[in-house]
Amino acid sequence: MQRNTVAMKRFGPLFIVVLMLLPFVCRSQTEQTPIRVAFWNMENFFDPFVDSTKTYNAFTEDGMQHWTKTRFYKKRNNMYKAILAMSENHPLGILGMCEVENEYVLSALFEQTPLKKHNYRWVLYEGPDKRGIDPAIVYSLDHFQLVESAVFPYYNPEDTTYHSRDILYAKFVAKVPEPVEGPSHIADTLHVFVNHWPSRYSGELETVGSRSCSAAILRAKVDSIIATAPEGYQPKVIMMGDLNDCPTDPSVYDVLRARHPSEMEEGCLMNLFGKNDGLGFEGTLKHQAEWQIFDQIIVTPAIMEDNVGLHYQEGSARIFHADFMLEDDETYHGKKLFRTYIGPRYFGGFSDHLPVYIDLVR
């Protein structure tokens, strides 16, 4: 009896501390840090060198935009600052990008800045865009293994002379502490599409058909993935990009059939940016006084299910808007984007779009 009393006096405080810490230890074993999946239109992310194989060389030192090495590295540093801030101390799992010229700018951003410690790799195909800018997918090797990738060309049967940017596709398997049972970790397989649909430069109504063509191509590819999936399995597909249309425009709402979760019907895709309810900011770009959401992340309903594998963390869809990416709008009031250029005028900012992201958990 005396021995037990002495033991309690000696180890009692330690025992109490262990009991107090036990809930936190158990929680850390069951909870995982969310994997952030983001998209950002980088706004003319060009290197400063002349490319003799291309006719568009505005973003060179002697070009129309006077794009010097100093300006390029300023842009590069701005972008990594924003990506680090958006990561919130954890590397992004996947970052879809558009308006990327080549692998040189990706290497400068992800291998020559503090981002290099996060073990990023990327997928980039140079396509037919007349300015030489393309979509890219950057992914963390700590989170994902690349299985395959491809591009799907833009095609409009009513105007075969018009060329636009390819849709970029990649298939990933998540790296998880404990493998999921089943072939190829099927519950942790992600199909990712990155889009940059035709712009409204020639007018919204004049170009609506072009964006509808991109929407039809994307929908056909998603339907093919769903149709060829193993029996009983619903594929997890993430579609992201600058669609140059709002969520309620015909290309997105009718052709792609992407709807806000509150408007879902059978056969529809889920647009997590379909309404600005809880997204954290007014829009992803500003036209005069009006904020719009051109940059969207759309998913198949399977990614919303939390019964097995990676799934969407409820309420995590956000428009990222650090204060340093914005400036006062003296013309239309409120805030506007702190851009690199407006026309030929150099301002030394970030982009004409804000990034968007969602979080995945397991």
Spans of features found by a protein language model:
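Active-site His/acidic residue clusters
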Residues: T53-Y56, D188-G209
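N-terminal, active-site-proximal structural segment of metallo-dependent hydrolase catalytic domains
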Residues: C26-K117, W122-I133, M325, D329-G334, ...
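Metal-dependent phosphoester-hydrolase catalytic domains
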Residues: Q29, Y162, D223-V237, D245-R362
